């Protein structure tokens, strides 16, 4: 997700012990590169992202309830991108915001 949309901001704080979750729509994606191939290492999120209501949401889309554990792909683990920090997306993208206001105009 963050690879293709440059306006998305990742948390990147020191990861804790809590595992990141993905919704059914995002299930199987690597949170760094959106690859569905060769999942390897579980995603760990920071303490701020694993607290309260956010703890149960998907770490990529942040809209749906997370059901399955998130994994980094083999390539991101090989390149060391799994050690960059917490991969949770903090903001909505400009595409989603524009879509929201376009729907509001039509009503």
Swiss-Prot record:
Pfam families: PHF5
GO cellular component term, pick one: spliceosomal complex
Broad class of where this protein is predominantly found: nucleus
Biological process per Gene Ontology, one example term: mRNA splicing, via spliceosome
InterPro entries: PHF5 (IPR005345)
Keywords, alphabetical: mRNA processing, mRNA splicing, Nucleus, Spliceosome
S-S bonds: none
Location in the cell: Nucleus
Similarity comment: Belongs to the PHF5 family.
Function: Required for pre-mRNA splicing. Involved in regulation of drug sensitivity and may play a role in multidrug resistance.
Subunit structure: Component of the spliceosome where it interacts with CUS1, HSH49, HSH155, IST3 and RSE1. Also interacts with YRA1.
Name the record gives this protein: Pre-mRNA-splicing factor RDS3
